[in-house]
Amino acid sequence: MRMGTNRRLANVKTRHETGLDYIMQSMNLNTPFGKKQLKELKPFFPGEEEELKKELDRVESMVSFVNGNSRTVEHIQELFMEVKDVSYTIARSENQTLAVVEIYEVKSLLLAMRKLLSITVKDGKNLVPEDYILEDTTELLDVLDPGKDRINTFYIYDEFSDKLKELRAEKRQCEIAIRKEQKAKREELKEKYGIMLTPKFDISVSKSSPDLEKISGIPELEAADQDYLSVTFQLKPTETVYEYTKRMENLNGELEEEEERVRKHLSLEISKYADVLTANCEKMGALDLAMAKAIYAISHDCVRPEIADEHVVEIEDGRNLQVEDILKSKGKKYCPVSISLKDGVTCITGANMGGKTISLKLSGQVPILTQYGFFVPAKKARVGLSNYIQMLIGDSQSVERGLSSFGSEMEELKEILDHGVDRSIILIDEIASGTNPVEGLALTRSLVDYLIKKPYISLITTHFETVTETEGVVNMQVKGLADADFNLLNREIQYANRRERINIISKYMDYRLCRVEKQGEVPKDALNIAKMLGISSEIIEGAKKYIK
């Protein structure tokens, strides 16, 4: 696991909006160690490309392992489900005497480690990368399991101490002697009074029974319990039973002391292996996390990203995993998107419903997943590491804070610009859409002028087409309905209700991006969509007059 850096790549909102949190929450981890490592996972930064490549090597190895060893993977996962976090117990063993249940937990962990080692190493050959191979802890297991039964139970066994064995043997003899004395007394009462005591050496008599007075008068019995229906009598202890019972009380005290001495010894033995156990737990967690990464990559058709030295994000047929999962649940297909970004400003233009925001999030999802050592949802991807990735989208709790959406947006923009550094990725969705169009356009153009001079990859979605006229700005447009068969679309939508119409239009939308080298005819997707959703022709035709 990657540790030791407190640098922040992205804030909480960006992690959420790019889908990083969603993906991490969707991963199936089974050990407390793996879950902890996922929660504490740190990203790789520029200058750490070689370390990241090694991490991706490990994930790639695990992908091959998972693909070729499905049954073994199931065994490991089943084993991991039974593993408990005993880190606190291991730490306690260094200065305190562990309870029996705590020693049992350590033994259970050792058995799991032994089984995992037998699964991951066959005939002297490692089936998983060396980083995940546990150190052998058989010596400690032998200490806790002197009989070498390798059963997942624990008891302070006689093998731990000769004195313990002797005390328990004497106690058993006392119990046998007491039992023998009680049985003899039971037979005596049977012959003398004609009554038969139970195997527990008692008898229950109804309060309405004529025998109650007779049995109450038997000197060898005493009342032990009663309710409104009956009275239970039990055998009085004889002098012999009393002596053996007294001896057993003394033996119990000696046994308690000896068992504590054994537990103290076992705790000390466990403490000697504290570092090894802790390291093995880390390896189990790392294997759990690597398997989860691999399984997620396989199930979601993710690929290993190529790590570039230069600051770029190149995505071929990329997919936003969260949106794709939603579409799959509805039986719909996701339209993959390709985009190539480098330092400078790129603007995505097009109508609403065109998927601009999804493409923006995808452009953040791929690099942030890469820097956390994940495979990415694309046919191919090439990523140069960033120092900072931030996304500005939505109104960020403006209602709770009493701010307008525009005011909140400006606060977020200030934070992003204040923290921007070399090799940053800045993702901005529809900036200044919450204010009047004249000022909104002016602010957007000025922001583009500012960002184009910075060593950032800046990607902005906008309705303001003229923003792309700035020299050096790359203009990407959503293809939308440009290639749609409107005759077919109109026939299909003619008798549909409102919800069905939106779904039908979405089906015909082409969400892929195309680069616009020269500003030509303004796209009319918004007018086409408005018309198909029932806006009057008079309004649509009137709107066309204002489009230049």
Give residue spans per PLM region.
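Glycine- and acidic
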Residues: N67-R71, H265-Y273, T346-G350, E430
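A general alpha-helix detector
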Residues: R58, D85-T89, H265-L266, E430, ...
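Extended, charged alpha-helical coiled-coil/arm scaffolds that mediate oligomerization and mechanical coupling
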Residues: E135-G194, Q226-D275, E282
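Active-site phosphate-binding and catalytic loops of NTP-dependent enzymes
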Residues: E94, L189, A292-V303, Y372-K379
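ATPase nucleotide-binding head domains, primarily ABC-like/P-loop NTPase cores
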Residues: H300-D301, A308-K548
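Amphipathic alpha-helical domain-onset/packing element
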Residues: A274-A308, E314-V323
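Charged, glycine/proline-rich intrinsically disordered loops and linkers
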Residues: E188-T232, T240, Y244-M248, A482-M509
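Conserved amphipathic alpha-helical "coupling/scaffold" segments
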Residues: M1-K171, K283
